Amino acid sequence: MKYIIFLVLPFLCSAQTHRFIYEYQFKTDSLSTELRKENMILDLNPEETKFYAYEYAANDSLNKIRNFKNILWDEELPALTRPKNSNRNTSYILTNTLFKVETEDPIKWNLSSDTKKVSGYNLQKATTTFGGRNWTAWFNTELNLNEGPYKFRGLPGLIFEISEDKGNFSFKLVKSYQLKSTYDTSDFLEAFDGKKALLISEKTLAKQQLDLYGNPLKDFKEMFKNSKGEGKFKVMNIEVKSMEQFNELTLKTQERMRRHNNPLELDKAIHYPAN
């Protein structure tokens, strides 16, 4: 792994964003052997840290040119913000509405004397148990930044790599650069389709997700009823011609929800009932 990182900037200049790009590999289904790969952004701003999908920023640039609202969201990718030097995270989750959940996430690290050198950078090992999973991190003390991807922070240096012991998740730093001004994410991270995220508790969100599981195609059913059979109506790329078809589609959707239930924080997985 070749890192493209500038270590000559010991601190963030006023009103600037220092951006780190991480390669994120993960399994949505823990029983699968396939790993999905996406690039994620860690923005270190003067007063706040943000973590979100790289494609959101790319799409936002196009939206601004076209004067479009953001309607891009990937439910399998984490998105969060936190104040500088804080463990208080605000996570953004899209169900039928964009919600935000505030959590306090302190992480207890165990520092190791093990080190390794990658692309000229000296990395030190640390381990932790977080979110019901065991993690191994490699960090660099030359960068006086106690940050890292997702909620992982608090080490005496920037996290370059972190992975889960069962191979379900990993983050690897691949690039870093400085932006001239603080990068504004208010149109695509903290909002969806022009609407700001609504604050909700973890307990209430879990209940809503269980309710959604019980009737996952509710909105599509209403749309089909209102269409009165006019034109073609597709769900999951399947043409629907009668309400009875929704029974089979509902079962397929529920099966997918059960299978794709492998969150970063395993102890927060929704316990969907088997049909």
Task: Name each region found by the language model.
Residues 10, 118, 122-179:
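Glycine- and acidic-residue-rich phosphate-binding/metal-coordinating active-site segment common to enzymes
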Residues 16-117, 122, 136, 167-275:
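Extracellular or lumenal secretory-pathway regions
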